[in-house]
Amino acid sequence: MRIGILPLVVKEVEKNVLKAVKEHVEEFYSRFGFKVETLPPETVSDIFFSYNPIRGQFLGRFFLMKVAEHREGFSAVLGVTDGDLYEEGMNFIFGLANPYLKAAIISLARLRPEFYNEKDGEVLKERAIKEAMHELGHVFGLAHCKNPICVMHFSNSIIDTDYKGKNYCERCLNRLKRNLEGRE
């Protein structure tokens, strides 16, 4: 069983962030028999039509569909982009997932400390790990959790992301174990 991590590059997806995400996902999901690999980066030139110049953002579902194109041979594929994403009815999204597509995408744009005039560069890695674990949880059948420190708690703002942990609470972990039992 494999999880792929696909960099979808608008300008730059930092290698150190990809490495941190890969290491954490691998450390956690290896207990279920998953191997994690980083795929070669891809540009978004073929889905640039999803860019809304008025908002300065990309429509996230097209990024998700591009990630899903790489799912063959993988149990899940996680896209990581530097593009600022949104969905209709929302100002922005940190990420998006679809369990039927076995695909998820996270956006680093609003996870960056400089977006909030913060200085701590290491916080980007922590935030990216949390959002990656959250979206992979959705891919593997988890819903949002009411526990504010569970990684599956919905992040309405960066404050929520910073507050929650980077792992699943006991309830979500048990549900994840059941969902992954017998998976090949």
What do these predicted ranges mean?
Residues 7-9, 110-112, 156:
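Short, histidine-centered active-site or binding-site loop motifs used for metal coordination
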Residues 11, 85-86, 160:
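Surface-exposed, flexible loop/turn segments at secondary-structure boundaries
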Residues 15-131, 143:
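Metzincin-family zinc-dependent endopeptidase catalytic domain
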Residues 2-4, 77-79, 104-105, 150-151, ...:
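Generic structural signal for residues positioned in beta-strands
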